[in-house]
Amino acid sequence: MEFVWDERKRKSNIKKHGFDFIDAEQVFNGATFTIVDDRLNYHEDRFITLGMLEDVVVVIAHTEEEDIIRIISIRKATKNEQKIYFKGFSY
């Protein structure tokens, strides 16, 4: 997989959320939970992935096309999103 992003959006995300898009690959190499983001009509297929970045559950908004993942944002998961993530792996 190749990871791409808009550099201005990356810098904005670091300031706003404290997470760097460069670290997205680390999240996707671990255990993840992905759903389709159909909250709005984005004119493209968007996904929300929950995963671990070091010891923090994060939410990554992204698109996927062939072998390319375009990162839109990364932020710390809310308490509810953390529950969803951990519940998904506790059968």
Task: Give each language-model segment a name.
Residues 1-91:
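Ribonuclease/tRNase effector modules and their secretory precursors
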